């Protein structure tokens, strides 16, 4: 049953009523326009600096490759440091790189290799801040506006791509690529100014920040033990791995299937963008009838049918109309999957979780095109498109086992109900490992319910930092259970007290109800001695 059947549709523009989000959204829009202008200008300039196809192709690699290596570390830094200051530093660095590219180009000092290297720096800067931009959205909009806010972000991305490409072409024709690079540098000024005036309220904590490598491991551990985040990742992979065939083969669709030229390619690209923009505006209306799981499934089927029509009917108007539906489906899945990832993550690990989600997303877009291009080369272009569409249909059915609609109901707000332990020993912050045991006396009729709830609690312990968790039954006293878990240091255990959510607190309440009357959980802490 659809959980959204009686929900009143939100206005897609409602998050813009929130002043902080409005200014951040406009600033990101302007910055993205500048980034798309740089991509167009740099690509054109490289063709005038070298005749090497490899160097020209490496421009795209320089923009996207850093994400594979930097997303997770940058997510860890974003969760450790102040996100506002981190974003400011990243944008200032990219602004400086853009100024250098512009000045070198205008002065005639730019070379193919220097352009490639400086573009790589911009790519690194973008990868450094990508998870942070996504992770601050829930900080500036209420949960009820999160879907619309993510939709506006995807809308802004597509609008900036169209505007940036058009402006770049006009400016290159009038003044050359150097002027485009200067415009890109200027686009950072607005976003830096907005960040400088944003009065962000950092999360309240009495503990020092995590160490970098520990933060990375914690992010990976959280993902491993978070079915909600895994569901968002699997649904995303199930769509984008196969749907990437559209972007991979779009130039060949224009040239070979439709027997067109650059203008045909431009029209096809515009059709995809129009569909994407339209669906972003209509998505709140769609959500009144379908939940996120249903939206992704329907969008995948629409994409498969529309792209199959493009592969079989080689008529320009038909192809543009079909690709318009493909663009709409693409954005529906992107917005729904991103919302599922956002709602699966508490604030303390949000940037790391978003970074891991984006790594799988970008990995699908990187690996998929290689496969579809190879199939097209071995067989034919329509065959590759139809194989991908068939795979997409099967994947949309197979991945339905991972439900994401329930993520909307998760409450990651810190419960603050768990009192800090009061040890009689002196325990250093980095002393460990630490073993925690909790004894439960369970009534026999409630045993099955207890084991189900304790397993859920164990997943929460591991998401919050436990490196080991297990439940044991006393062989000499049936019904007496010992929960044991290990954390690396005493400080990590104190962080667990800060991180435990209202969702996990409800699980603990349900467990208490299942215990024998007159008993309560008995907690003990054991720490590795400083000297052996």
Where are these predicted regions, by residue range?
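Small-residue hotspots at the loop-to-helix junctions and early N-terminal turns
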Residues: 38-41, 45, 50-60, 151, ...
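Helix-loop junctions on the cytosolic side of multi-pass membrane transporters
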Residues: 135, 139, 181-211, 289, ...
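An amphipathic, aromatic/His-enriched active-site/gating alpha helix that lines ligand/cofactor pockets
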Residues: 405-408, 459-468, 486-522
């Amino acid at each position: 049953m659809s959980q959204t059947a009686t929900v009143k549709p939100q206005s897609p523009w409602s998050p813009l009523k929130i002043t902080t989000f409005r200014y951040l959204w406009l600033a990101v829009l302007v910055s993205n326009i500048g980034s798309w202008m740089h991509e167009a200008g740099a690509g054109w300039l490289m063709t005038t600096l070298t005749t090497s196809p490899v160097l020209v192709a490496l421009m795209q690699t320089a923009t996207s490759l850093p994400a594979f290596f930097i997303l997770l570390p940058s997510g860890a830094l974003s969760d450790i440091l102040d996100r506002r200051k981190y974003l400011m530093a990243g944008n200032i660095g990219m602004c400086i790189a853009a100024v250098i590219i512009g000045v070198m180009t205008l002065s005639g000092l730019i070379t193919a290799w220097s352009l490639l290297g400086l573009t790589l720096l911009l790519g690194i800067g973008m990868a450094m801040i990508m998870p942070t931009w996504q992770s601050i959205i829930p900080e500036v909009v209420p949960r009820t506006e999160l879907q619309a806010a993510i939709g506006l972000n995807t809308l802004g991305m597509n609008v900036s791509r169209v505007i940036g490409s058009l402006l770049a072409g006009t400016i290159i024709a009038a003044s050359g690529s150097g002027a485009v690079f200067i415009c890109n540098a200027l686009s950072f000024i607005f976003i830096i100014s907005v960040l400088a005036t944003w009065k962000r309220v950092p999360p309240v904590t009495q503990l020092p920040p995590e160490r970098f490598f520990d933060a990375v491991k914690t992010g990976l551990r959280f993902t491993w033990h978070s079915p909600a985040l895994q569901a968002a990742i699997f649904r995303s992979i199930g769509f984008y791995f196969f749907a990437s065939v559209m972007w991979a083969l779009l130039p060949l669709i224009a040239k070979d299937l439709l027997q067109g030229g650059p203008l045909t390619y431009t029209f096809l690209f515009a059709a995809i963008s129009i569909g994407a923009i339209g669906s972003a505006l209509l998505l709140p209306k769609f959500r009144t009838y379908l939940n996120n799981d249903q939206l992704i499934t329907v969008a995948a089927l629409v994409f498969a049918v529309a792209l199959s029509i493009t592969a079989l009917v080689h008529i320009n108007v038909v192809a543009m109309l079909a690709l318009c539906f493909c663009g709409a489906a693409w954005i529906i899945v992107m917005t729904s999957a991103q919302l599922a990832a956002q709602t699966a993550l508490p604030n303390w690990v949000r940037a790391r979780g978003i970074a891991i989600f984006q790594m799988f997303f970008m990995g699908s877009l990187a690996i998929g095109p290689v496969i579809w291009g190879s199939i097209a080369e071995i067989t034919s272009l329509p065959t590759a498109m139809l194989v991908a569409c068939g795979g997409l249909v099967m994947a949309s059915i197979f991945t339905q086992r991972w439900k994401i609609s329930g993520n909307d109901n998760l409450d990651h707000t810190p419960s603050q109900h768990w009192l800090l332990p009061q040890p009689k020993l002196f325990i250093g912050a980095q002393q460990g490992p630490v073993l925690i045991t909790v004894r439960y006396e369970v009534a026999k009729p409630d045993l099955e319910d207890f084991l189900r709830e304790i397993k859920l609690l164990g997943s929460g312990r591991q998401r919050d930092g436990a490196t080991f968790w297990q439940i044991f039954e006393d062989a000499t006293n049936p019904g007496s259970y010992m929960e044991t878990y290990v954390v690396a240091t005493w400080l990590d255990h104190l962080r667990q007290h800060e991180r435990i959510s209202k969702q996990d607190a409800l699980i603990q309440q349900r467990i208490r109800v299942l215990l024998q009357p007159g008993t309560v959980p008995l907690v003990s802490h054991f720490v590795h001695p400083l000297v052996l």
